């Protein structure tokens, strides 16, 4: 996997320049999935309720992206995931930031070379938003040292940032998960934007000098612009606000420039202090689509893929409001109750085509999240993973699972029907691990 580390160096030294990848070409590519409503990839993905891409006669031309994408493969580690205690019912972490050395060792020993640390800024930040507790940053320091020790790239990510978190779209009455939502909006409040930039200037100063082969910064998880006051008032006139109202395609794309402005502010502040730092932006909205307006910035763009949501989030508590919880047991390819294919490999190829176009223009890409919740049957999960990872291999892209230990991972998933192997006090899903290893070596 040294190839990935070498490729990283190319990203830092190559000038991306201008790109022919435009917003118009993106919309044209996205339109091949007419029935796919844009929803947050990390929360929901794309919901398929209509014909598959093949039924829509979508057959995007394949291209072979340049092999400059970092070939990083690995997992998300959640020790600083959220200060909201309800999440600990679903993910095995204590929110103490104590990233486990065994995780790094096993990830290395199993042939992987990447960890993403999706974190909640409130774990180390005072209510004034500008005071950072140095003691609470030390666990992140340790994780970076463990990455160096085991030859694993560490991606520092704000899963919750000042004024922005995709989890704030959830309805506690439906999910049963209490989320302490942001009180201000990074897109409309200059003070909050300054606080967001302050987080990244702090990290840039603290970790300056650590090469980008070892460390990268992921600005914010699955960016999404929530409805402003006028839009909320309009929604309320139509009736009770639903979770899906947050993910209206037209409104989200209309606000894309709001996110690019915020992303540029943070990236510029980082590079002012550490010009060589690799900066990563998730796709917009919700990690789903490339961002043409950021194509010339030198940032790597990251896709999160949980498509189709009916398969990847079957019976998942925190997508209630997008799914009902009464959906039938999924199959792969995904079919409706009459046997009609709703989503298959060709559908996924069409969904990923905008990312292929972006990569072909010289913009590095990576898939920073994916996976299937524990209630997806193991045979369906493995078939979906095999197709998805094979497509990502054709894109010359690395990828990471959400998560390592827990309901989306390879350890302690509690997935019914899986023949687990005892592994040093944990339950290992050996068939999934073997499949991941196969694709990580491809």
Name each model feature, range by range.
Residues 20, 41-67:
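C-terminal segment of N-terminal export signals and the immediately downstream linker at the start
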Residues 55-114:
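N-terminal carbohydrate-binding accessory modules
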Residues 78-99, 128, 312-345:
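Acidic/histidine-rich helix-loop elements
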Residues 177-341, 352-373, 394-397:
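Active-site region of glycoside hydrolase catalytic domains
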Residues 377-442:
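Aromatic-rich peripheral "rim/lid" segments of glycoside hydrolase catalytic domains that contact
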